[in-house]
């Protein structure tokens, strides 16, 4: 009786999940792939690792573990997953309205002699960033100007230029052609530059180091240069603050901006939110670095699935926090992150037989 009851419950839960995913992907993914997708993301939330053997054990199906494992391996090896499907899903669930502040950064790790290097474009939101689009880079080191432009153009094609408020990026993301592209596209940006960059000042013809414009700043002070300047041959505005780096040494944080340099420093601070997302994808969430995959196409599919699960968990956390707010400790920080709050709840529901709660968490996927 218990086994039959459990099987019935499992079938009901899967039916609810598959119906929800079908409403999201429509005719863009066949039913067999939708079923796999659902089983995989649920298993991922349960075991919180990308180890295929552990995921196969957590598949909520009557199939044997070896069969589930082969199913995972076939999906990674053969299926052509369209990243735009995942991007549209994440975009549809964003808990705030456009235009959005975007941030661009890289995440990388090493497995054996293989370097995994991924360029990510994300939407920042209250201490975290939602990865929207990403590009696997077949090399180690910084991204190229062309790779950045392709990622931005993909975003614009999917969601429109009007959905972008500004782009935030670190010192890696500079260069004359890159800034020129952003200027031509009228995309507002706040990008950190190196303090020793040469700056040309049109109003007097002077050529100075960027740091010279702000050498009077004291610790934790900030200022912006009132006139427009040339950096790498491109017109922009500059602002700066003097901060202490990780070693406690004072240094200038100089920001190049399309406009509104008076707001650059406060906006640039939001760039770090993508690091919270990377942490959730890695050690504090799904441990994507545990993968033994080295093939770019397979890692691409795995990352798309992990981003889907991350978004599900975070949206669940937003909902839970709205009805049972996370406690704030004496130092002013939350006792746990919104992401962890949501992931813990999803995991508990997925391990239970509560159909009502399962139906509730499926609604988070369709934003209903």
Which residues are covered by each model-predicted region?
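TOPRIM metal-binding catalytic domain and adjacent DNA-binding surface shared by DnaG-type primases
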Residues: 42-46, 58-70, 75
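Short alpha-helical "recognition helix" segments of helix-turn-helix
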Residues: 55
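Active-site-proximal, Lys/Arg-enriched surface segment
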Residues: 65, 69-126
């Amino acid at each position: 009786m218990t086994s039959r009851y459990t099987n019935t419950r499992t079938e009901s839960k899967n039916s609810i999940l598959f119906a929800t995913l079908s409403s999201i992907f429509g005719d863009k993914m066949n039913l067999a792939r939708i079923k796999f997708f659902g089983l995989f993301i649920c298993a991922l939330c349960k075991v919180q690792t990308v180890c295929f053997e552990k995921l196969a054990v957590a598949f909520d199906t009557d199939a044997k573990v070896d069969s589930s494992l082969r199913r995972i391996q076939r999906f990674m090896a053969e299926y052509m997953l369209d990243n735009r499907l995942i991007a549209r899903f994440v975009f549809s669930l964003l808990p705030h309205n456009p235009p959005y502040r975007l941030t661009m950064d890289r995440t990388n790790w090493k497995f054996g002699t293989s370097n995994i290097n991924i360029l990510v474009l994300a939407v920042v939101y209250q201490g975290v960033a939602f990865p929207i689009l990403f590009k696997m880079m077949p090399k180690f080191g910084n991204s190229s100007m062309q790779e950045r432009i392709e990622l931005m153009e993909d975003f614009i094609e999917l969601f429109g230029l009007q959905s972008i408020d500004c782009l935030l990026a670190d010192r890696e993301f500079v260069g004359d052609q890159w800034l020129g592209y952003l200027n031509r596209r009228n995309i507002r940006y706040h990008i950190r530059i190196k303090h020793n960059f040469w700056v040309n000042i049109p109003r007097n013809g002077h050529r100075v180091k960027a740091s010279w414009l702000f050498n009077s700043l004291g610790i934790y002070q900030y200022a912006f240069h009132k006139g427009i300047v040339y950096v790498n041959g491109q017109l922009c505005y500059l602002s700066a603050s003097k901060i202490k780096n990780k070693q406690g040494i004072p240094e200038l944080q100089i920001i190049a901006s399309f406009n509104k340099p008076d707001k650059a420093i406060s906006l640039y601070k939001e760039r770090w939110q993508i690091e919270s997302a990377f942490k959730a994808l890695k050690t504090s969430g799904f441990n994507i670095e545990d993968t033994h995959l080295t093939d770019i196409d397979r890692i691409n599919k795995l990352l798309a699935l992990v981003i889907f699960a991350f978004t599900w968990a975070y949206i669940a956390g937003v909902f839970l926090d709205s009805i049972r707010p996370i406690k704030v400790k004496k130092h002013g920080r939350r006792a746990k992150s919104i992401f962890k709050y949501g992931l813990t709840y999803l995991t508990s529901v997925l391990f239970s037989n509560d159909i009502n709660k399962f139906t509730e968490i499926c609604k988070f996927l369709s934003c209903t």
